[in-house]
Amino acid sequence: MTEFDLSTREGRWKHFGSVDPIEGTKPTTKNEMTDLQSTHKNFLFEIEEVGIKNLIYPVNIDRFQTAGRFSFSTSLNKDEKGINMSRILESVEKHYNNGLELNFDTLYQVLRTLQTNMKQNSSGVDVSGKWFFDRFSPVTNIKAVGNADVTYGLAIEQDQITRKEITIEATVTTLCPCSKEISEYSAHNQRGVVTVKVYLDKNNQVVDDYKDKILDAMEANASSILYPILKRPDEKRVTERAYENPRFVEDLIRLIAADLVEFDWIDGFDIECRNEESIHQHDAFAKLKYRK
């Protein structure tokens, strides 16, 4: 058995099974290598979407940096075997070097760059991340950082937007109207998870504070908002407000819809509320879809 010098890293590697590279016969320079993806012939079908998922990249959402989880895709013509996926990362990196602000204008520019690099007519992106914002306690006005999950979706054909949407998931308090009605005192309440997917007007700019307006519709119609910091006067206010505003899941999604339908920059929306029931082992949920 061969003895290796265990005092060196290379010796230890070989001791644990590493071997020297073989003398290869295939090209080692890019220009000499076969580019299978660029093969052109009849491959039977055009592909609507091909790309990458679960790409994690730093992004800025308003004042805070967070981790964005991206899904990118482009079309693929029938006479092309595949796409060059490394060009997707190159397109993202180009815009990251300029500071990757997570908004529709930036995503549009990334997709246009992607189309050029990939030589394709259509492209799309979905990216999700934590949206952080200031949240003040209701009585003592103490500032802390709240958060919600946001997902942007954008797709373009040539230079025209074909899909423009944003999804926000936030947590609220819901107090049971039935429990309040039948009980001598108190009522059970729980955390509700509200998800709103908004289909935005593709042909016009949305208002600057669209995320805040959507989140306000989700939270203000609940029994109570959730706060990072609550002192005793705040807790009293939150508890009493919830009791004054009981909500079934059905109530909540209808009230949210009534607010959203008034915005002229919204073409439609999907709403779901899921209550993590405090007196059951199951959850309660309700869904609603609306298109103008």
Curated annotation (Swiss-Prot):
Coiled-coil stretches: none
GO molecular function: GTP cyclohydrolase I activity
One GO BP annotation of this record: tetrahydrofolate biosynthetic process
Pathway assigned in UniProt: Cofactor biosynthesis; 7,8-dihydroneopterin triphosphate biosynthesis; 7,8-dihydroneopterin triphosphate from GTP: step 1/1
Assigned EC number: 3.5.4.16
Enzyme class: hydrolase
Domain of life: Bacteria
Positions marked as site (May be catalytically important): 176
Keywords, in A-Z order: Hydrolase
Reactions the enzyme catalyzes: GTP + H2O = 7,8-dihydroneopterin 3'-triphosphate + formate + H(+)
InterPro entries, alphabetized: GTP_cyclohydrolase_FolE2 (IPR022838), GTP_cyclohydrolase_FolE2/MptA (IPR003801)
Family as reported in the entry's similarity comment: Belongs to the GTP cyclohydrolase IV family.
Xref: HAMAP family: GTP_cyclohydrol_B
Function according to Swiss-Prot or TrEMBL: Converts GTP to 7,8-dihydroneopterin triphosphate.
Protein name listed in UniProt: GTP cyclohydrolase FolE2
Protein's organism: Staphylococcus haemolyticus (strain JCSC1435)
